[in-house]
């Protein structure tokens, strides 16, 4: 009996535990990846605003709010920084700038990133009086900083810094979430729990399939699509 007990404790028990633990990890991985893919799908298939003239805002306190004005195709027409919040508190100057830009570039909608100072920036924007009806949206910033530092963004905007590129990405996400988000490695969009703990090969495969199926579902306008949508 002693020998059997010893053999069980020394040999069998550890191998059963290892196997059980591996099975549990696999199950947990599958579930986490399923949730991650579902979240990504929701983000990619968010309803696009379409071809409208958009102002993109990457909000901030000390560093100011980066403003970009985009035409209906998402091309950058203008960029500047305003400081409506502490510590600079240049509120009235910032308000004048915003109202002027909305009029000058005939802006139809404003996209505000959901990061630092987002709520205060939304309040600031909605409390101004404009010469037109404006839609104001708060947009997920996840992955925008990854995009703005990427080769893709550098190729498109070589003469602008990362903050301007980030604001452009926020504005474009409102116009066409799918077209903008496919430029970013899906794992960087940050819509999953424990994404660094799960099997990375499985995760990549699942996310690639999700992106592909969303692009196939929505279809692609060959005249306006970027190479990221077509590959």
Residue ranges and their predicted role:
Residues 146, 155-231:
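Long, highly charged, low-complexity intrinsically disordered interaction regions
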Residues 74-107, 111:
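Nucleic-acid-processing active sites and adjacent nucleic-acid-binding tracks
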Residues 59, 72-73, 81-82, 115, ...:
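Short, ordered loop/turn segments at secondary-structure junctions
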Residues 1-50:
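Extended, charged alpha/beta regions that create polyanion-binding interfaces
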Residues 107-117, 137:
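Short glycine-rich phosphate-binding loop at a beta-alpha junction
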Residues 120-144:
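Short acidic, glycine/proline-enriched helix-loop-strand junctions
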Residues 48-76, 174:
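Gly/Thr-rich phosphate-binding beta-strand-loop-beta motif of the actin/hexokinase/Hsp70
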Residues 64-72, 80-82, 121-124, 147-158, ...:
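Short acidic, glycine/serine/threonine-rich loops at helix termini
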């Amino acid at each position: 009996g002693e020998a059997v007990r010893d053999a069980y404790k020394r040999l069998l028990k550890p191998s059963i535990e290892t196997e059980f633990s591996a099975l549990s990890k696999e199950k947990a991985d599958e579930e986490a990846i399923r949730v991650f893919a579902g979240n990504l799908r929701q983000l990619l298939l968010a309803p696009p605003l379409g071809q409208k003239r958009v102002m993109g805002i990457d909000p901030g306190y000390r560093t100011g709010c980066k403003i970009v004005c985009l035409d209906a195709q998402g091309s950058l027409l203008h960029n500047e920084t305003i400081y409506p919040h502490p510590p600079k508190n240049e509120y009235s100057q910032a308000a004048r700038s915003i109202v002027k830009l909305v009029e000058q570039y005939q802006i139809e909608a404003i996209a505000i990133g959901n990061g630092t100072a987002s709520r205060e920036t939304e309040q600031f924007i909605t409390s101004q009086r404009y010469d037109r009806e404006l839609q104001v949206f708060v947009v997920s910033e996840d992955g925008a900083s990854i995009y703005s530092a990427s080769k893709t963004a550098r190729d498109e905007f070589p003469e602008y810094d990362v903050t301007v590129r980030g604001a452009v990405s926020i504005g474009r996400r409102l116009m066409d979430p799918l077209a903008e988000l496919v430029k970013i490695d899906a794992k960087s969009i940050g819509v999953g729990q424990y994404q660094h703990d799960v099997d990375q090969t499985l995760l990549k495969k699942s996310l690639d399939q999700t992106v592909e199926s969303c692009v196939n579902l929505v279809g692609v306008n060959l005249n306006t699509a970027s190479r990221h949508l077509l590959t």
